[in-house]
Amino acid sequence: MMKFFRQQASQPAAKPGEKPAAPRRMGPPKFTPEQQAEIDKYKEEVKAWRLGLDLSKVEGARKLLSDAGISVHIVKMQPSGMGSDEEVDYAFKVAKAMGAKAVTDEINLETAKRVAPFAEKHGMYMAFHNHMQYAEEGFSCDPILAISPSIMLNFDAGHFFGSTGIHPNEMIKKYHDRIYSIHLKDKTGPTTGDQPNTNQVWGQGEMPLEDVLLLIKQEKWPIYCDIELEYDIKPWSDSVKEGDRKSVV
C-alpha cells in the first residue's frame, strides 16, 4: 500500500539553477479506480485480521516486555484511520491488554468526538499528540478537551517549542491535569538561523529540557515523560548508544 502513497508524495527535483518548488500542501491523495480498489481490499483484510486477533497473543507480548523490565503506558493505534467502530473498540482492547491506560492519535476535534465514547467505555484515555498545530492561527486544544474527561493530551513539548518558540512550561502549567504524557526531544526554535525547528542531539538544541523535567519533578505531577530519538544518528553510533542512560543524564 505504501507505494501508492509514495507516488502521491513524490515531487520532481529542481533543475540546476532553478528555485526548488514550494512543498505541496498535503491533502487527501487521489488514486486511480484500480488503486482505490486494491486499497479497499487491503483495508478489509486488515479489519478481518484485527477483529479476529486472539488477545492472548497481545498479553503474551506484554509479558515479554514486562520480563525485560518494560511497562507500557500508551499505545499508538491511530483510531482516526480505522473505518469501523469495531476497529476503534479493538484499538482500546489491544492497548488495555498491553497494560496501557491510553491510546494516542494526532490531535483532531472530529476524532475526539468519535473516540471519546470508546475511551469512556474501557475506562481509558484518548491522549492526543501534536506536531505543529499550536503554531496554526486560531488553534486551541480547549474544544477538544471539553468533549470528555477521557480526552487527554500526549503533549509533544519538542514540536510545540520548535514550531512556536513558546516555553513548554506555559502549556504544562495550564493543562497539567489534562496531560497524560509528554514527548521530549531537543530542537531549535522557529527563528533559529538556517535550521529552524530542527531536531538536535539531546542537550545540544534550544529546547528547555531541564526546565520541563524540573517543573514536573517539583510539582510531583503524575505525567509520563518519554524521550524521543528523532535526529539523524552518526555512523559511529546507533540508537542503543544514543539512548543509553549516561547519554541523556
Residue ranges: model-predicted function:
Residues 1:
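Mature N-terminal segment immediately following signal peptide/propeptide cleavage
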Residues 6-22, 29-31, 38, 44, ...:
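Histidine-acidic metal/acid-base catalytic patches
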Residues 22, 32, 36-38, 43, ...:
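Active-site acidic/histidine proton-transfer and metal-coordination neighborhood
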Residues 51-55, 59, 85-89, 109, ...:
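Non-membrane alpha-helical structural segments and their capping/turn regions in soluble enzymes
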